[in-house]
Amino acid sequence: MEDDDVADFFDFSKPFKRTVVSGGYINGAVKPQKLNIQTLPERAHQGTEYAEKFCREEEARLMEGWVDETLNKSTASRLEQVDDMSSVMEEDTQHLQRVRAKELMEPLFSRYNFTVTPNRLTIHQSKQDILKAIRENPVVVLQGMTGCGKTTQVPQYLLEDAYNRKEWCNIVVTQPRKIAASSIARRVAEERNCALGSLVGFKVGLKEMVSEDTRLTYVTTGVLLNKLITSKSISSYTHIILDEVHEREVDMDFLLIIVRRLLATMRNTKIILMSATIESSEFAQYFKIPGPNSLFAPQLAVSNVTQHDVSVYYLEDLEKLRVDFTIKYEQPDVHEKMYFLAAKVAVVCDRFIDEFESASTIDYKPSIIMFLPGINEIERMAEVLRNFLGDSNVNSQEQTKFTILKLHSMLPSEEQALVFTKPSPGYRKVILSTNIAESSITIPDVKFVIDFCLHRVLVADTLNNFTTLRTQWASRNNCIQRAGRCGRVMNGRVYRLVNKHFFEHGMAQSIEPEMVRCPLSNVVLKTKLLDMGPPHTILALAMSPPNLSDVSNTVLQLKELGALLRTAKGVYDLQDGDITYLGNIMSTLPLDIHLAKLVVLGYVFSVLEEAIVIAAGMNVKNIFCQLRTIEALRVKRHFANGSASDGIAILNAYNWWRSIREQGTGGDTTDWCNRYMLDRKSLIEMAELVQEITMRLKTANIRVVSGANNARWTDRERTVVLKVVMAGAFYPNYFIPTCVTDRELSDKMVYTEIGGRDPFSTVFFCGFDHSNYIGPLYRNEIRALLTERKPTSEKHQVKVEFERSTNKIFVQFQYPPDQQSGKSLYEERNSADRVHPGVYEAIKLRQLRHNQSELLVMHHNDAVAYATEHRLGVWRNHEWHPRSVEIPNAHLSVEPPIHWNRVTATVTHVEHPNKFYLRPHDEKNDNIYHDIMEKLNGCDAVLRAFPEGYAFKQRDIVAAPLPNMVTGKMARAKLLQQCLVRGVEHWTVFFMDFGLTAGVSVKSFRQLRGTPLDMFTKFPDRVFLASLAEVQPSAVRSPKDVWMEETIKHFRQLVHGQQFDVEVYSVVNRVTMVVLRHNPDDPIDLTVNRALINSHHAQLSEESYMSKMNHEKRKRVQFEMELDPMYKTQILNDISEQQRFLEDDDVDSLELPRDLLKVRLMLRGPYSPLEVKCSSTVFSGYRKPVIIEKESLNSVLLDTNPQNTHEKLLVAGCVNETSNSRLIARMTTMMPNIPGLPALMTLIFAPTCLVKKDPDETRVVGLLAGLGTDPRTGESMYPEHDMSLAVDIAIDDDDIADINALRYTMDSILHGGHNEQTPMFGEYSIESLMVKVKDYLIKILQRDRPIQDNRSMAHDFSWVKENPSTSTSSQKRLRSTAIDIYTKAIFPLYHNLNLRPMTADRMEFLRQHCKDLHLLTQSRVPLPKGGITCRLCNVTLESDHTLRIHFYSKLHCDLELKINYRR
């Protein structure tokens, strides 16, 4: 910078203008609004027009296969797969087939019953018609309503027909759900009186019950689909029956494509399509095959004759119930008044209709079922029903008694089963259900159906890769199926809460097929395995082809995940790409593609078993029950064990359940699951899925690598690596927890919002008027708001305080000490989280209560009279003054006063590096301490025991024996909490002169008060609480952000009982931040603080705003004391800092009279100053508000390290988008607190990254990650998923080299041979590569990197072409070792950074700038309006006070060190 620029910078008379400087240097206070105006480039939408060409070609190919051949009427007999017929004369072929069929089938004919017993099912009347149509046509469409018997009977008809004709048969029947395939097979086997797995069997995933005798197999759609993709043939079956085709699942539609394509060349297999809807003509048209009478496949309809009448009513039929609202049909949703209408209908059905329509088939009141679109609507409907029945005007005679039951997929199976139970006498079941009861569950006693005619469907936005559960009007077919829930055992009534005209003309006949609205990732992978052309040419042949844009976007997503290469046969193709080994594995797993990648990365990082469990748990229905309660949050946090990860909570819960089930401990697992609020059925399903995934991986030669030198993780490392694996699998679902303001200002607000209290244990309410109400009276009531179901002992650990200058109430949660084991307060806390669990639960309560809590209080006059009568204080000058007690001898306190800079002290007790006690060695304190210990333990000491039955009180001071002392040395002890141990009264005490907390029997107590030693009760503690300054647990060693036991042990051995030179950094909330030196002259690198960091037991930490503020104040006071002797004398004589007051808590024991609590206050909250929100990092989502699903651990998202200025990272397993464009992050994981982790994870796992530098190219300031640019146009390939990150750490060439080595090693493990079917390395090589993966990862995560500030780069989505000449020799060397791996790399390597050193002129300018800023703070010259910018850090400071505090930030200190500036 030129000299005149420097002069201009310090010329404060000129106006300040905040601008954004190009290239990365910006004014730190200016929000990057200009960058935010970047908008996504619009890509042309491509519809289904592309499909017409491919459909014409396919139809022509199909017709050509049939045109020259006359259909063989008896093609059910075929044995091509049994014998080679090539040498036999053509005229003898059929004869030999019949002979061989007889030989193979006759043993089965004699062993099993092939005759169908007639039954009452309606389909039996159509038996001969069905068999005739199947014999004469290659494809038949059979329509029959649910319950007609088509699924169980038609396959048996074919078995019987084969028996009668003595022909070969092999029948397969598909079912959309696993449970249906197995249960139907079991039922058919029972009907045929044969063992399951003999003549009749099933295949579900890898679970099967089949044998050589099996001729009828029920399978899931996916099983048959995978078999046909692998074999590319249908010739092994005589009949393929595709059931429930009307559901139009994506697998079924893709199966139809394959079957139709293979049918053209393999015409001897019969295809039967079975549908439950009346609109089956589209299936017939899809199979255009010449038949005896028509070009289309014939359709057969099974008559649907029922014994009971079902009446249907619409909204206009309910006018007598005062329908006073209008439905906006263009906006599908539940109108609030519809809930009340449905409640009225339910009451009318209960009170009046049953009086003249009694049900004679059952001896209790038949049920009502209501169909609602989702869980939230079910909860609201239940609330309305409860309120409706509780209204005395509506239910005055209490005639209506409902048992309200909920039914949806998130409920545990035990709760779902309640809908089948018989209600209590006089009660009627009202079942509130989603569409789960539409077809999956049948409840026979339903008489009334109340249908809101809505449902939620999954809709995929393939452009942004977000999925949305969208509320839509159900189809008429859906509503007809819902109506079929009644009328089974009695007459029924159906009430549709829409107008009849809208139902008939405004609602679609059938639901939109999944192929056009759901994610296509798995089906596109299957098209690649099918190897019959690019994905879009295959999917064009679907009954309802997806949009070409959706196919293209899905291909991009798969390329982003590494399942496809960017090129197809070496050529870049937007709509195609070669499948990788990773893609091959992903396609074989029954998982979402992100979860499949999680499993494969688990293999790469040597945590395969854990990754399989997490993936399976995320794939099945939630294993946790009652997710929206405090108890559920508590249980889930227990399983998470401080990891802040939904995935790890699933892993721990599953492992614990499995160990109990396998070892038989803990009694019945059902009781255990109930106790820990787990869904046993989901756990069993999860266990089966874990087994299936494991077996599928073994077939792909992927298994846990064993060996003497394999990569092994410690328990603490495993938590970190599992989070890393999830970050890799779920890329780019990255979210940055953000504060509303600047990070430094945010840290300040954390403390100012709660008046300087501990933010990790404090919440606050708003809306309490201290001028009208006496807050201290209602401590118990306020505690009850947050501790409703907690034991009394825990309620006493909740401290309630009031701030009269605001309308706030502060609630502070305290950790109860372990009375029996003598465990320290923090060791209790250390086992959970840094933030008190009560804070999480309080915030969750607010969410559940919709931000309001009700508090009953007295009228003002009543409260003043009551409080005055009980001598609780006095009302004076329009405010309440509670009585208080003064701490005596405050001038004798040993807490470091403001003028202390250094002190010699001994460490008396250690709990961990952030909590230990020091006894200072000055003449006054040493004399007092020795006097106390001598009088208590000297030869002349005679201590009296307390009388029997003495009533001890909290805060009493007694003499008690120190624990673990053989001599029984006595010391002063303050009573904290009472407890009983084996029936004997004990107290948890604090030893005031040692800092130790322990449980002691009252029998050991000795009196001090009222004795010659009474004065010792009036001396303050002789120790003070200390914490190592600028030190926090290592995020790699301590992923839970708490101190590990080995670190505590190491620190205890290092300091306990040792004397140190103690540098006092600050004092905040009676905790002293210190630097420990063995000798006063030791440099900073030889301090205990730095020793822990150098040994990787700890990492550097930013001090909190309060700590930096106190530090700055101390430095300023000490500096002025040196200059002004009078000021020094004043400070030395000032004891106000040590003076403490305690409010009398006796008021807590008073029970307020209920009759006086007449005023209802609605408090807002509770809130925590640590609460943060998230922002998305991808282009398509960074402007959208983000919420975390309520069931997630991180639904209460708190910043556990607000003092740190670096960004944290939250990863989501799945992201949905609501109708109002809000993103919902699901299955979330909070990543370890490692500086720069968002950038590091992106560099490791992104397909490619553009590294952005500052204008001088001296440092990295940002990353742009994604698929990169189209080599033909230079434009972003997938702009919606481009991820922009500011880099807030210093990244250098060493980092890039290690990241490249890690990416190359990962690619080496994942890269396959020529056909990419199996890894090209043997197990020994894989083992050594996995060790390298571990070593590189630990090296990357443990490296200490300076902090920097580059927030301006957070939303810069512009790609800049790189200079190809920057390719490094190391990169070229890696390429030459394995050209094939590099050209087909999933994780291509990065270019070297080639950063330039900072110029001498620039460095000198910054040093002078820092010097000027320091002089400015000492000159007392006010800063200009708008503040001043620290050019070193790019941060604007508004006042000289904030400027001084900024000097102590880690960001500023690191950069001062970088430019060699010495203060």
Curated annotation (Swiss-Prot):
PROSITE patterns: HELICASE_ATP_BIND_1, HELICASE_CTER. Its EC number is 3.6.4.13. Residues 951-1016 form the Tudor domain. It comes from the Eukaryota. Residues 348-531 form the Helicase C-terminal domain. It is found in: Cytoplasm. InterPro entries: DEAD/DEAH_box_helicase_dom, Helicase-assoc_dom, Helicase_ATP-bd, Helicase_C-like, P-loop_NTPase, SNase_OB-fold_sf, Tudor. The keyword Manganese does not apply. One of its GO terms (biological process) is spermatogenesis. Keywords: ATP-binding, Cytoplasm, Developmental protein, Differentiation, Helicase, Hydrolase, Meiosis, Nucleotide-binding, RNA-mediated gene silencing, Spermatogenesis. A motif (DEAH box) lies at residues 243-246. Residues 131-296 form the Helicase ATP-binding domain. Its main location: cytoplasm. ATP binds at residues 144-151. Probable ATP-binding RNA helicase which plays a central role during gametogenesis by repressing transposable elements and preventing their mobilization, which is essential for the germline integrity. Acts via the piRNA metabolic process, which mediates the repression of transposable elements during meiosis by forming complexes composed of piRNAs and Piwi proteins and govern the methylation and subsequent repression of transposons. Belongs to the DEAD box helicase family. DEAH subfamily. This is Probable ATP-dependent RNA helicase spindle-E. It comes from Anopheles gambiae.
